[in-house]
Each structure stands twice: as structure tokens, then as C-alpha cells.
Regions:
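A short glycine-threonine-serine/GTX helix/turn-capping micro-motif
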Residues: 19-25, 132
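C-terminal-biased regions
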Residues: 124-134, 140-147, 158-187
Length: 187
């Protein structure tokens, strides 16, 4: 048990740098992209309702966190809700192996999510911008992913996912001017 705990700490440290986060980002993009495509094709009403419930929970906890961005418990809560939303997409594939793999790397994914949320909200604060709902200020939103699944739009899902994951810089989250060269943005 002790060695497992040390292994978890080691893994988090191994991936807690720019290159490591990129590895996690690519794994998430691979799994979440494939599962989103499957969800678009074969999700049930029950699947979609579960995803909507996770979306509503995320939106509520995001709003609570945005009112107190230095509160570590509120950050933890929104990270867990964010993970639950993305895991629900994995579950919509009905592929047990995808679900197991995602859960095996849950701590790494949660660390990636935490980094993105924390960095982006503090970047917005430093720029003097509203800390309101990200869904209201950018197309890189969980709502956009949800709607793309409902509407069967794989391209919209890919665009939103790549911005949420930090693969493509998101206006309103990663940059605030008309254009910033993506090479100048460091997530």
C-alpha cells in the first residue's frame, strides 16, 4: 500500500510539467474524442440525461468557485465535477476498457483539469476580466460539447474539446485580444 501511494505521488510529479501535461492532454483527447464520436452515434436518452446532470453540477460548482478562486476546497469540488462530466462522455461509449483506462489515470486527468481551471481563472482575474461562467464567455465550453453530442455535430465537439483541453488556445480563457500566436501561450 505504501509503495502504491509513493507511485501515485511519483506519477503526479512526473506529469506535473509542460511535457507531462501535454502527454495527459493527448491521452484525454484520444479517449474523449473517440467516446464523443461514439456518443454522437449511439447515445441513449438516458445517457444524454446523465451527461446533462453532470453539466448542471459542473456549472453550479464552477459558479461557486468563481466567487472564491483562492478556496482550495471549491477548486477541488469543481475539478471533481469537471472530471465527472468528461468521465460521463467516456461512459457513453459503453466500452468498459475505455472506462477502466480513464479511471486508471484519474489522478493525472484531475491534475490536468486542476491546472487548466486554476491557470485560466487566475489569468482572467489578472487581466481584469469577469470570472463568470466560462460557457458565457467562450465557445470552449462544456455546454458546447454537450450540445454537439445532442446535435450530432462531431466537428463542433472536436473544436470545443480541443479548446477545453488546451490543445488549441481558447479566446476568453487563454488569450483576450483579437489574436495571440498560439506559440506564445503557455498552459
Amino acid at each position: 500500500r505504501v509503495s502504491r501511494g509513493l507511485g501515485d505521488v511519483y506519477k503526479r510529479q512526473l506529469y506535473d510539467n509542460k511535457e507531462g501535461r501535454r502527454d495527459v492532454e493527448q491521452l484525454r483527447n484520444l479517449l474523449e474524442g473517440e467516446c464523443t464520436n461514439i456518443a454522437i452515434i449511439s447515445s441513449t436518452e438516458e445517457d444524454r440525461q446523465k451527461l446533462k446532470d453532470r453539466l448542471d453540477e459542473y456549472n453550479l460548482l464552477e459558479a461557486i468557485y468563481n466567487d472564491d478562486i483562492e478556496n482550495q476546497q471549491k477548486l477541488h469540488d469543481v475539478v471533481q465535477a469537471d472530471f465527472a462530466f468528461h468521465y460521463e462522455i467516456i461512459c457513453m461509449s459503453h466500452n468498459k476498457l475505455y472506462m477502466d483506462i480513464y479511471m486508471m489515470v484519474q489522478q493525472l486527468i484531475s491534475s490536468h483539469i486542476r491546472h487548466l481551471i486554476y491557470t485560466r481563472v487566475h489569468r482572467r482575474k489578472a487581466a481584469g476580466l469577469s470570472l463568470g461562467s466560462m460557457d458565457a464567455i467562450t465557445e470552449a465550453s462544456h455546454e458546447a460539447i454537450y450540445q454537439s453530442i445532442i446535435n450530432g455535430d462531431a466537428e463542433a465537439a472536436r473544436n470545443a474539446r480541443e479548446q477545453i483541453l488546451g490543445i488549441v488556445p481558447a479566446h476568453g480563457l487563454d488569450y483576450f485580444e483579437d489574436y495571440v500566436d498560439p506559440k506564445d501561450i503557455h498552459l
